Amino acid sequence: MANTTPFAAFHLDVAGASAEEQVARALARDGMVTFDAIRSRGELLQLCNRLGTIMKHRDADEAGLTRIAKRSDILPAEGYQAFTSSHLTLHTDGSSTPEPATLVVLWCVRPATEGGMSLFVDGKQIYQVLAKEYPQVLETLSTPNSALFAGSEPPVYGSVFSTHADGSIFVRFRYDGLGYYAAPVCSVLPLFLELLERYTLSFPLQKQQGYILQNGRWLHGRTAFRGEREMYRVLICTDPATSLGISVHLGFQPGL
């Protein structure tokens, strides 16, 4: 069962003069920021350009904005569930790309009439629980080349948890028809999924509310919904030459 967490718990004023410094500190500490100071797509793009480089995406427009809404022109298919009203399972954005976006930004234009709750799980918390209580499961989920993430050409071979050269941990996961796992991983997936459910946070996004998510740390999804829910998503790669990019990159320090 998802634990409802107030939107205010991660809230920051992203329009302030020192917003970048505050966002950098919050993302380095918590991996998530929520905001309600953006009033237009133009302001959203301005915010995102301050955070890093906007990444192009298959479904994005020329500016890098992806409109996330129920679309009748797209037939149901793996990798396109975001454009339906169905439940969207917890996942890493760009799991099938070698270097996924550092940040995912989602901004609400129109909330759902019913449902459409945003779902989140802190991969750092899951990692720490596994390290303390189920170290053998963590070892299995960290085995190199124990997972295949399809959806791009070529697909990516990796693992649910991987370690970067600097010791930081990156979570890469999807649980749909484009995620394939070796037999040892499949044997521990029920426990992993149980932990995801146990530690899921949820809250609705109202009009002109949004969030910034550290993509290598937090998994995200949504519940099924009714109504004309409309969101805009932007994928961002942080620049290590900036103050934000120095402290916010793809992954987390497991012991901090």
Feature map (PLM): residue ranges:
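N-terminal non-catalytic cap/leader segment that marks the start of a structured domain
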Residues: 1-66
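Active-site environment of non-heme Fe oxygenases that use a 2-His-1-carboxylate facial triad
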Residues: 2-14, 23, 63-256
